[in-house]
UniProtKB/Swiss-Prot annotation:
Function text: Transcription factor which plays a key role in the Hippo signaling pathway, a pathway involved in organ size control and tumor suppression by restricting proliferation and promoting apoptosis. The core of this pathway is composed of a kinase cascade wherein MST1/MST2, in complex with its regulatory protein SAV1, phosphorylates and activates LATS1/2 in complex with its regulatory protein MOB1, which in turn phosphorylates and inactivates YAP1 oncoprotein and WWTR1/TAZ.
Superkingdom of origin organism: Eukaryota
GO molecular function: DNA binding; DNA-binding transcription activator activity, RNA polymerase II-specific; DNA-binding transcription factor activity; RNA polymerase II cis-regulatory region sequence-specific DNA binding; sequence-specific DNA binding
Compartments reported by the entry: Nucleus
Residues making up the signal peptide according to the UniProt record: none
Tissue-specificity statement: Preferentially expressed in lung and in skeletal muscle.
Lineage: Eukaryota, Metazoa, Chordata, Craniata, Vertebrata
Protein name: Transcriptional enhancer factor TEF-3
Length: 427
């Protein structure tokens, strides 16, 4: 790997985590309408549209600084809308009942046996939450159908008219509420009616549309860390931020989308800026990552401290990649580092690894100053105007392989760094 030093523009050059409200586990009210009255069912359906399936991960409500499981959030939504208490277990049981009902409806609706077998095979790999969830189910069945296969219309819907969308609770930013769109199916999976897909029809790899990946490059891992040597043989590593995408599956929901115009002012606008890059394309290479950084570590001992960044990528192609990382303040570039990485062939694909790349002095000082602020809201106020733009290109063709915009808050959890990934689109 070859690497340039950090330079200024003017220079020559996710586990299951306990949390949420204990009130959600209280016994149900003995309301006369029964456990799932029409009013409660409406609120339940609203919550399904608002909160996507998230597996064992937690959803962070930035207004409260708390993390909730999806069923907790659904129960919370029912309580807020109706005043009736439903437990997480009741929500889980209701989802399973609806999933079985939906599976039976789909079997009855599909006349073609091959299509029915394909749908059943697809549903077998899904959780009840994903079957019931509107967007996840639609995306999954689109993949099961393949190009040109009929959509199963009538079995999914978006957020109900007049109800809040996802952005009301799961937001990429704390101060400014940017519209978050539901996941979009990838090009090539279309509706309505068409023939059964050919067995030879190509299926997009599972990471496309579900993780930070374009058609030519997939980010496997990204981390920024502080490493200390405790003794000659022992190192202690603290992760400020971390992304791991090593094992996506077709059962994972598609990423939500954010209109890229909502974040133009947070990144450089001159030549080579985010706007120009997006106009040049390809459009499937652009992503937004909201980090909740973990600053819960002692950073005063500088003697043996190393601040670094590591990242790893995979591609079906052998090429030389260039990774540009721009640190921005109030939308203006402060420093930039450019690194070049060569491919290593392994198990039928090419790996690119940028290992222990040192953080610049500006970033180290920034972390120190941030850490010494007395309150988290002060840190978040500073971070609102701090962003990082990472652009990975093919060195020889200058094609954009990945463009990732990073925004930050401080994690309010004792369980470490958190993140949420969005696709950037232009509506």
């Amino acid at each position: 790997m070859t690497s340039n030093e950090w330079s200024s523009p003017d220079s020559p050059e996710g586990s299951s985590i306990s949390g949420g409200s204990q009130a959600l586990d209280k016994p149900i009210d003995n309301d006369a309408e029964g456990v799932w009255s029409p009013e409660i069912e409406r609120s339940f359906q609203e919550a399904l549209a608002i909160y996507p399936p998230c597996g064992r991960r937690k959803i962070i409500l930035t207004e409260e600084g708390k993390m909730y499981g999806r069923n907790e959030l659904i129960a919370r939504h029912i309580k807020l809308r109706t005043g009736k208490t439903r437990t997480r277990k009741q929500v889980s049981s209701h989802i399973q009942v609806l999933a079985r009902r939906k599976a039976r409806e789909i079997q009855a609706k599909l006349k073609d046996q091959a299509a029915k077998n394909k749908a059943l095979q697809s549903m077998a790999a899904m959780s009840s939450a994903q079957i019931v969830s509107a967007t996840a189910f639609h995306s999954k069945m689109a993949l099961a159908r393949g190009p040109g296969y009929p959509a199963i219309s009538g079995f999914w819907q978006g957020a109900l008219p007049g109800q809040p969308g996802t952005s009301h609770d799961v937001k990429p930013f704390s101060q400014n509420t940017y519209p978050v769109q539901p996941p979009l199916p990838l090009p090539g999976f279309e509706s309505p009616a068409g023939p059964t897909p050919s067995p030879s029809a190509p299926l997009a790899p599972p990471w496309q549309g579900r993780s930070i990946a374009s058609s030519k490059l997939w980010m496997l891992e990204f981390s920024a860390f502080l490493e200390r040597q405790q003794d000659p043989d022992t190192y202690n590593k603290h992760l400020f931020v971390h992304i791991s995408q090593s094992s996506p599956s077709y059962s994972d929901p598609y990423l939500e989308t954010v209109d890229i115009r909502q974040i133009y002012d947070k990144f450089p606008e001159k030549k080579g800026g985010l706007k120009e890059l997006f106009e040049r394309g390809p459009s499937n290479a652009f992503f937004l990552v909201k980090f909740w950084a973990d600053l819960n570590t002692n950073i005063d001992d500088e003697g043996s401290a190393f601040y670094g960044v590591s990242s790893q990528y995979e591609s079906p192609e052998n090429m030389i990649i260039t990774c540009s990382t721009k640190v921005c303040s109030f939308g203006k570039q402060v420093v930039e580092k450019v690194e070049t990485e060569y491919a290593r062939y392994e198990n039928g694909h090419y790996l690119y690894r940028i290992h222990r790349s040192p953080l610049c002095e500006y970033m180290i000082n920034f972390i120190h100053k941030l850490k010494h602020l007395p309150e988290k809201y002060m840190m978040n106020s500073v971070l609102e105007n701090f962003t990082i733009l990472q652009v990975v290109t093919n060195r020889d063709t200058q094609e954009t392989l990945l463009c990732i915009a990073y925004v930050f808050e401080v994690s309010a959890s004792e369980h470490g760094a958190q993140h949420h990934i969005y696709r950037l689109v232009k509506e």
